[in-house]
Swiss-Prot record:
Location of Phosphothreonine modifications: T21
Protein name in UniProt: Protein-glutamine gamma-glutamyltransferase K
Gene that this sequence comes from: TGM1
Location of Phosphoserine modifications: S23, S80, S83, S90, S93
Biased composition (Basic and acidic residues): 59-87
Length: 815
């Protein structure tokens, strides 16, 4: 690939540096309202059936908006978790008349606005936004909502009323950032407002929004015109309106035609992320927390920090691409700093995170990139952001994921004449697993047939158009090897469906293909199943069945567009000895055994010279030095099978072990009789224990309850500086517990209290991290009963104790 490559994205974490991006400035105070004196028709003369008429005289539309009006996030974070009670609307004493500033008798003065924004009101329930821990109105585009206007006198048929929504620094009608909706008039573009009831001094409205509307936080105002004059309601932060994508709206290009999918991929606040190896799959629960207080503002702030034009924020293709760039910190001081070095002393070990909320709120609060993340953290945060904004999104794990660095669309491994790896040439790598995201949308920018799931990958691996982002890329184009479809299809295709090609240096210095491993990449692609915590194998949507004609055609079609289009020609095929690797399923701290099984499938005796090299490996495919090796010659009778075993003691691998507890067995061999080359790379991992969580008593909204956490140290050494994390949407805000040291093989018990703030089934998630042991986590489902009398309860969720609290052990025990 021609663009710059990131050592951070591939494996080497750079030390955390003091960020250069300053904290976001507070939202500026509103400028004094001023009336445009330029010529042209009056506001009401130019107010056609709908503001979407693209009138370009945007600076003549009455009082100018102040800077950062209704910005995508603003720096005013919601300051109340609130109850379901409504705030009083703006009263007459707080209004300003347009024009000379006086309120004349007979003028239609707006004395208040009720946006029906509480969680129990019709709007939030119908728009599936009632779980957001916000008091402001949150709606989804393309779907009507209701409001009530309160006037100083009864509304008359001769009165004219218009609603206005504004977003951005310089709202313009033509860009969709200044929306004007005349009440009672039909309009184009999907915006309109209808009177549903006029009663006394109240006017009930049903407002229709465009299915193509910009997403973000809009400021809202009302204008009126009567014979006595014109009036405009001043902007009020309480009347800000959030507009999101709408997968429930058939006219929205993010529409999803399966309610169970919408419940899972938009509304589910937790999920499972898979890791490890194909043969030893691990799973962890992740708290997405997209409805937690402050998270929506953090998601919109990400778009602001990127400087994304407001006019493009209605396009999910553009929004998802920006998010893929901004969730990592490279180029743009985004959310997370990647680190694969193993040294996390200046931040948080990526394995210690249990969810996205702590990360996003830290970024919103400080404006600084958060240390540290690896692929599953980038993907977990991306799922949170895209679900929060209204895109159906899932977290996907690809086992044996290739990282193609030269656009050959193959994984190339180079050996010398004796089949010893040439590390200075081996730039491609195969990750044990890699985690990315699928999000659902139509692709109007592509030919037909490429709608549906799109890959978005926020892990910084390679540049795309000069920045570290990836996607959205149609899964359909990946499946069929159509690598010329945007965005980043060649790189993603290679991750799931390239072949591992072994090259041997010849006597004249040239290289020859000696073996092609066709089923080594993208061997299993999984995500959490809809409606359950089971795995859902989605390999079939990414690739045709391995070995099928369609799959071979896809690979060869893709390779023809790569940098080595003739890689599939002139291959030798004398292969009658089969090789298989087996590794014992062992727990960290135990001894283990690895084995190679050789089978002679021919009719003649075969003599095999076998070499085994064992090293530790990061999950990204970057290996440490070989710490154990074995050489053996095996004679195989026709049809015979022989097993070659290599025991590995804990004391041998303990000094070498790295993150994820992964090891790589390199096997190479040579058959004397026919020259067949044997080559195999097998990765396996050591399992870590789980935390055991037990709920002590019933969980009720607003009432304190307690959880017990039990952990047994599997290692014979002391764990130092042990840190627990606890988090769960609707249960517990992110909490850090410092517990000190835990002795070798010791069992410890902690008790923690929390106050649930939302009813229903919830997930409470915990993790443990120390320099000696990581990737330890646990989860418990908590079924929360409503508070007596019903209703929501938002009061500093999980705020019982601060971050970084030192917690004494409830009990300690031996092995």
């Amino acid at each position: 690939m021609d663009g710059p490559r990131s050592d951070v994205g591939r494996w080497g974490g750079n030390p955390w540096q003091p960020p250069t991006t300053p904290s976001p400035e507070p939202e500026p105070e509103p400028e004094p309202e001023r009336r445009s004196r330029r010529g042209g028709r009056s506001f009401w003369a130019r107010c056609c059936g709908c503001c979407s008429c693209r009138n370009r005289a945007d600076d003549d539309w009455g009082p100018e908006p102040h800077r950062d009006r209704g910005s995508g996030s603003g720096r005013r974070r919601p300051d109340s978790r609130g109850s379901d009670s409504r705030r009083p609307g703006s009263r007459a004493s707080g209004v300003n008349a347009a024009g000379d500033g006086t309120i004349r008798e007979g003028m239609l003065v707006v004395t208040g606005v009720d946006l029906l924004s509480s969680r129990s009101d019709q709007n939030r329930r119908e728009h599936h936004t009632d779980e957001f821990e916000y008091d402001e109105l949150i709606i989804r585009r393309g779907q009507p909502f209701h409001m009530v206007l309160h006037f100083s006198r009864p509304y008359e048929s001769s009165d004219r009323v218009a609603l206005e929504l504004l977003i951005g620094n310089n709202p313009e009608v033509g860009k969709g950032t200044h929306v004007i909706i005349p009440v009672g008039k039909g309009g184009s573009g999907g915006w309109k407002a209808q009177v549903t009831k006029a009663s006394g001094q109240n006017l009930n409205l049903r407002v229709h929004t465009s299915p193509n509307a910009i997403i973000g936080k809009f400021q809202f105002t009302v204008r009126t015109h009567s014979e006595a004059g014109e009036f405009q309601l001043p902007f009020d932060p309480h009347n800000e309106i959030y507009i999101l994508f709408n997968p429930w709206c058939p006219e929205d290009i993010v529409y999803v035609d399966h309610e169970d999918w919408r419940q899972e991929y938009v509304l589910n606040e937790s999920g499972r992320i898979y890791y490890g190896t194909e043969a030893q799959i691990g799973e962890r629960t992740w708290n997405y927390g997209q409805f937690d207080h402050g998270v929506l503002d953090a998601c919109l702030y990400i778009l602001d920090r990127r400087g994304m034009p407001y006019g493009g924020r209605g396009d999910p293709v553009s929004v998802s691409r920006v998010i893929s760039a901004m969730v990592n910190s490279l180029d743009d001081n985004g959310v997370l700093i990647g680190n694969w070095s193993g040294d996390y002393s200046r931040g948080t070990n990526p394995s210690a995170w249990v969810g996205s909320v702590e990360i996003l709120l830290s970024y919103l609060r400080t404006g600084y990139s958060v240390p540290y993340g690896q692929c599953w953290v980038f993907a977990g945060v991306t799922t949170t952001v895209l679900r929060c904004l209204g895109l159906a999104t899932r977290t996907v794990t690809n086992f044996n994921s290739a990282h193609d660095t030269d656009t050959s669309l193959t994984m190339d491994i180079y050996f010398d004449e004796n089949m010893k790896p040439l590390e200075h040439l081996n730039h491609d790598s195969v990750w044990n697993f890699h985690v990315w995201n699928d999000c659902w949308m139509k692709r109007p920018d592509l030919p037909s047939g490429f709608d549906g799931w799109q890959v978005v990958d926020a892990t910084p691996q390679e540049t795309s158009s000069g920045i570290f982002c990836c996607g959205p890329c149609s899964v359909e184009s990946i499946k069929n090897g159509l690598v010329y479809m945007k965005y980043d299809t060649p790189f993603i295709f290679a991750e799931v469906n390239s072949d591992k090609v072994y090259w041997q240096r010849q006597d004249d210095g040239s290289f020859k293909i000696v073996y092609v491993e066709e089923k080594a990449i993208g061997t299993l692609i999984v995500t959490k199943a809809v409606g359950s915590n089971m795995q859902d194998d989605v390999t079939h949507i990414y690739k045709h069945p391995e070995g099928s004609e369609a799959e071979r055609k896809a690979v060869e079609t893709a390779a023809a567009h790569g940098s080595k289009p003739n890689v599939y020609t002139n291959r030798d095929s004398a292969e009658d000895v089969a090789l298989q690797v087996e590794a014992q399923d062992a727990v960290m701290g135990q001894d283990l055994t690895v084995s190679v099984v050789l089978t002679n499938r021919g009719s003649s005796t075969r003599t095999v010279k076998l070499h085994l090299y064992l090293s530790v490996t990061f999950y990204t495919g970057v290996t440490g030095p070989v710490f154990k090796e074995s050489k053996k010659e095996v004679v195989l009778a026709p049809g015979a099978t022989e097993r070659v075993s290599m025991p590995v003691a804990y004391k041998e691998y303990r000094p070498q072990i790295v993150d994820q507890g992964s090891m790589l067995l390199n096997v190479s061999g040579h058959v004397k009789e026919n020259g067949q080359v044997l080559a195999k790379q097998h990765t396996f991992r050591l399992r870590t224990p789980d935390l055991s969580l037990t709920l002590l008593g019933a969980a009720v909204v607003g009432q304190e309850c307690e959880v017990q956490i039990v952990f047994k140290n599997p290692l014979p050494v002391t764990l130092t500086n042990v840190v627990f994390r606890l988090e769960g949407s609707g249960l517990q805000r992110p909490k850090i517990l410092n517990v000190g040291d835990i002795g070798g093989n010791e069992t410890v018990t902690l008790h923690q209290k929390f106050v649930p703030v939302r009813p229903g089934p919830r997930q409470l998630i915990a993790s443990l991290d120390s320099p000696q042991l990581s990737q330890v986590h646990g989860v418990i489902q908590v079924d929360v009963a409503p508070a007596p009398g019903g209703g929501g309860f938002f009061s500093n969720a999980g705020g019982n104790s601060p971050l970084g609290e030192t917690i004494p052990m409830a009990s300690r025990g031996g092995a």
